[in-house]
Design a protein with these regions (language model features):
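Cytosolic catalytic regions of ATP/NTP-dependent phosphoryl-transfer enzymes
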Residues: 1-113, 117-146, 175-183
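Short glycine-/small-residue motifs
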Residues: 149
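Short, acidic loop-to-helix structural element flanking the phosphoryl-transfer center
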Residues: 152-170, 179
Length: 183
């Protein structure tokens, strides 16, 4: 199922999540991707993920620990957040990483079989504007596990942008009446 969110001149389409292993459900991957967003985010990508979860009727069973979200950096091209099950008071917190697929594959030390499965799943998606949002989980005492990716397409309405730029920059100096007088 494809869900589309239009934010000003940006159109974001979120498709069903692709699990790295058959053990994980696409709904769980999308829920973790949404919960790993910074609290109160107005970013178009975060809003598109939230919109997709709401359209699909996915509940968000995790709560983010206060001030636990860390933004991506040059050394670490993915964000991290500490989540906890919202409905259980005694649930243990765990870390979620969300971001660049290649970086999370390296972090999780993904096997070549899982990489091949993910590449096969990506072949059906258009390469233009396609960005896989990868999700990985780290529970205490266990290594990082790549759960899967949420395919997202970002498209800008370049016609409106180019027209706005042209209207802003265009100054009528050599207009038709001046050209007629010149000839």
């Amino acid at each position: 199922m494809k869900t589309t969110l239009i934010d000003n001149d940006l159109t974001l389409a979120v498709e069903d999540a692709i699990p790295a292993s058959p053990v994980y459900a696409p709904e769980e991957i999308l829920a973790l991707a949404v919960c790993a967003s910074p609290n109160g985010s107005r970013d178009a990508g975060d809003l598109a993920l939230l919109h997709a979860a709401r359209e699909r009727g996915i509940t968000l069973p995790y709560a983010q620990r206060e001030n636990s979200w860390e933004a991506p950096s040059r050394e670490r091209p993915y964000s991290t957040a500490v989540l906890k099950a919202a409905d259980k008071a005694d649930a243990s917190p765990f870390m979620v990483a969300r971001g660049n697929l290649k970086a999370l594959e390296k972090l999780c030390e993904v096997s070549s079989l899982e990489k091949e499965r993910m590449n096969t799943a990506f072949e059906e998606h258009s390469p233009s504007g396609f960005e896989p949002v990868a999700v990985a989980v780290h529970r205490s005492g266990a290594p990082w596990r790549l759960l899967g990716v949420v395919p997202m397409h970002a498209m800008r309405d370049v016609r409106r942008l180019s027209m706005a730029k042209a209207n802003f920059r265009y100054f009528h100096v050599w207009d038709w009446p001046l050209r007629v007088l010149h000839w």
